[in-house]
């Protein structure tokens, strides 16, 4: 059985997808249409905007604006991640 952990006071928007082994710390706000890849973690008191994609295994430690794709640890914009991790 695959589990996810959603802590206290977390708000999750409509049509969001959360894969297995994800942890979301307390009082975070997840927008609408968000996709969170497996084995990712989101620190507490963060705002994840609408239409955000978080790649698997990512560690989110700061707010993510709307319409952004991030990955890595710490999570950063996918273009920056791909440029620095060739």
Could you say what each language-model-derived stretch is?
Residues 82-86:
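Long, leucine- and charge-enriched amphipathic alpha-helices
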């Amino acid at each position: 059985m695959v589990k996810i952990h959603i802590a206290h006071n977390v708000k999750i928007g409509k049509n969001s997808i959360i894969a297995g082994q994800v942890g979301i710390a307390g009082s975070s706000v997840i927008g609408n249409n968000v996709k969170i890849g497996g084995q990712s973690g989101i620190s507490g008191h963060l705002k994840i905007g609408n239409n955000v994609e978080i790649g698997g295994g990512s560690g989110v430690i700061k707010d993510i604006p709307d319409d952004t794709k991030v990955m890595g640890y710490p999570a950063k914009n996918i273009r920056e991640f791909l440029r620095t991790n060739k």
